[in-house]
Amino acid sequence: MTVRRFSRLIIAVTGGLVLTVALAAPASARTPVDPSTLNPPPPPEFNPVCFVDGSHITCDIAFSDPDVVDAPSGIVCGGTELLDSHTRSVVGKRTYDADGNLLQRHFRESWDGTFRNPDTGLVALWTQDDTDIHNLAVPGDFATGTETQSGPITRVWLPDGGTILTDAGHLVIDVATDEIVQASAHHPLVFGDPAALATLCAALD
């Protein structure tokens, strides 16, 4: 499992960050844009609503992924891999230049899930609510630029309410290499701190 995949599963922004969205003009004043003409186009399942926004094109998006049930988590406890189940919903926007090339993705994800030890049947709950900003280095080239995730991060706890782990801080990821190029604060989950993961394993043993 890459650092990026694990961070996308775990990293959360639980503070009061709010997407920076320009005040919308009345719907009647918007000039609609066909999402399929953009580079790259937002997937249809994102329910994009695209329109001319000054010198740019903006697409509002909102969607939920299919539920994930008992997927491998990448966290191994004494030879047993914990299973992850979760839901994910997303709201946000994409900004394109006047030629229809993607410049920025700005979105907020809400996750709720569990880690389950299949041997013991014990479960830990986790939640996250992260805000991400992906600024493309090359307009239209999705695999370039940096993605920033910041703010207070994930909480993992037991059903009786006892907190097992928290993860908080600021991360900058190089999208092309999938590497974290800047990190601040406390990230035991993102970086797989053995002591932190041992605490989770012990709670589910």
Model regions and ranges:
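Beta-strand-enriched cores of mature, soluble protein domains
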Residues: 30-205
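Secretory targeting and sorting signals
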Residues: 1-30
